[in-house]
Each structure stands twice: as structure tokens, then as C-alpha cells.
């Protein structure tokens, strides 16, 4: 059993636990991509989770309340050792300005069990949001989480949103099986 008290926290942006690969990222040169492309002339030393970006193109621009300038165009996929692409490329990339390639661990990792109870934050802020981490961050491919339970207690009318207790990013083939996570209260600050 783990008790997480978020009523008085020094740094709410940090994860409590991190599951990471011990493999170092690799450098790949990918000058361009086309939508639905299925192969690259690149041969990584092992299968990799890859994210490509074109910072000259913006997507998902929001207008009106909470407007923003959108996000850099990006796609992620699995690049196999033989250069085949697994996953769909959604956009055309006349140029790729950034490539992130993370080798995928071949041996599966299984995390079993655990009951976590979070006493929710009560952070006050008049404008905008500060998303809280205070979670388990998974950045390792071929990982399975089985039988984890997360409860939230002590929510009030004041507080900030969480980014998710199980936060999976920059990896592939992650399975969450027989897990239970309590939803958090919704707060309505705009701006």
C-alpha cells in the first residue's frame, strides 16, 4: 500500500515513480516522410519507437476560449530493423526538423499489483491550470502493468487537474491489464 499526500507538495510536476529503458536513444537521419509511407532507408540496430517533428508546420490550433497556436506537427511509429514502418504516418513531411528514436527493449517487463491512495491537491490559482504529475511515468516499451489500483480521496472545490496516474509516453507496446484508477474532479478555471 502506498499513501500519496498531495495537500502540501514542493514540486507537483515530478512523477513519483518512473519505468525507463536502460537503452540509450539512437541517432537517425530522416530527411522527409510522406503520409502512409511504409519503409525508410534507415536501419536502426534494433526496433525503435520513433517520433518525427516538423516545427515549421502547426496543427490543432485552438480558437476562442483557451486559444493557442497549436502544436508542432508530429507523428510516432515503430521502425523495425529492416526499415519497415509499423503504424500510420498521418502527415506529409517535406522536412523533418527533429527525430527522437528510442530502442525497444526485447525482454518484456511486468509490474504486478499495488494499491495507491492519493489525497488530492488543494492548490489555488486564479488564472489557468498547473497540471500535476505525481504519478507512475512509463517510458519503456514492452511493459505490462497488471492489477494496479489507484484511489483518490479528499477532493475539495479547490484544486488542479492531474495528467493521469499511469502516464505512458515515448514508447510502444504497453499494456494496462486489470487496473482500476479513480477519476478526478473536474475544475473549471478558464484562461
Regions found by a protein language model. Give the residues of each.
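Extracellular/periplasmic carbohydrate-active domains that bind, remodel
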Residues: 1-191
Amino acid at each position: 500500500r502506498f499513501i500519496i499526500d498531495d495537500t502540501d507538495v514542493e514540486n507537483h510536476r515530478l512523477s513519483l515513480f518512473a519505468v525507463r529503458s536502460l537503452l540509450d536513444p539512437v541517432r537517425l537521419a530522416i530527411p522527409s516522410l510522406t503520409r502512409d509511407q511504409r519503409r525508410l532507408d534507415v536501419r536502426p540496430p534494433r526496433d525503435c519507437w520513433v517520433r518525427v517533428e516538423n516545427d515549421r508546420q502547426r496543427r490543432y490550433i485552438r480558437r476562442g476560449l483557451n486559444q493557442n497556436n497549436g502544436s508542432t506537427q508530429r507523428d510516432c511509429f515503430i521502425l523495425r530493423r529492416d526499415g519497415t514502418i509499423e503504424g500510420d504516418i498521418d502527415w506529409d513531411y517535406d522536412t523533418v526538423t527533429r527525430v527522437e528514436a528510442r530502442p525497444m527493449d526485447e525482454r518484456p517487463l511486468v509490474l504486478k499489483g499495488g494499491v495507491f491512495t492519493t489525497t488530492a491537491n488543494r492548490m489555488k490559482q486564479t488564472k489557468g491550470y498547473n497540471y500535476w504529475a505525481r504519478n507512475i511515468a512509463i517510458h519503456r516499451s514492452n511493459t505490462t502493468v497488471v492489477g494496479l489500483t489507484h484511489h483518490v480521496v479528499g477532493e475539495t472545490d479547490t484544486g488542479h487537474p492531474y495528467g493521469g496516474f499511469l502516464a505512458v509516453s515515448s514508447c510502444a507496446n504497453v499494456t494496462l491489464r486489470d487496473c482500476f484508477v479513480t477519476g478526478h474532479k473536474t475544475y473549471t478555471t478558464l484562461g
